[in-house]
Curated annotation (Swiss-Prot):
BTB domain residues: 147-206
SMART domains listed in its UniProt record: BTB, MATH
SUPFAM superfamilies assigned: POZ domain, TRAF domain-like
S-S pairs: none
Protein encoded by which gene: bath-15
Domain MATH: residue ranges: 7-123
GO biological process: protein ubiquitination
Keywords: Ubl conjugation pathway
Pathway the protein acts in: Protein modification; protein ubiquitination
Protein name: BTB and MATH domain-containing protein 15
Amino acid sequence: MVAASKEFVFHHTFKDVSQLEDGDFFKSPEEIHYNAEWFILVIRTKDQLEAYLHCDNEKDDNVAWTVDAEFSLKIASSSGSYAMKFQKGCFDGFGLGWNDFVSWDSLTEDFLYDNSFTIEACVKITKMTGFSKDVLRSFDESEKRFSDVILVVGDEKFYVLKLFLASHSSYFNALFLGKFKEADQSEVTLQNIDPTDFQSLLEVLYGEPAIDDGTIDGVLLLAHMLDVTLAIRKCEEFLIEKSMKSMRELLKMANQYQLENLKTVCISKINTI
């Protein structure tokens, strides 16, 4: 099984840049991706523009957490030139970035348009710890008598029914009802899956309201990887009816996961603007 890759891109346009003096800063609005809050901070320091990516735990500031990630920040000019830097690091409450992202002269001469510039963050999460969600339904040992297989995901065990999962997912149908060795095993390990995302996915299948703007990235990624059509449909309905994500984000998700109804709604809204 191909690993689920937690990746996302977000942009922000900083305006009235000429007003920035030494020590002044701009902060982008926060965006929620994979249960974490993300924003970009830029600071003018003498003759440099500093640029940092920040991550925070939206659920609980009192719990120790970390996010290992690879990311880049990029600004581009109308002529096609760009400034971009790449970094690997661990977010644990402090921003990561550069105190010399681009010189102030270069920014004002090469990258400003109408006294503004747009910065893009491309992020790939490799590991998350300390992020939790409210449990809407338990799949722990208390469910043992209602299950026929234990799925080991990360350091958690989920007690579930093979036929139930097989009826919702072509992946589990092949795994449990096909000729794989897992069909006869009472405990199966699923590699490269986040247990928090898997918990949310199971809750969706059991009818719980587990989808929100914080969980949907992980649920949709996993549902697409495991071909769980019901969860994909529920995610699309949420994105159309309730999500607060930007039109840019919605269109990106529609294209990435072939969500044609969402794509149609987005295009219709754009055409009426």
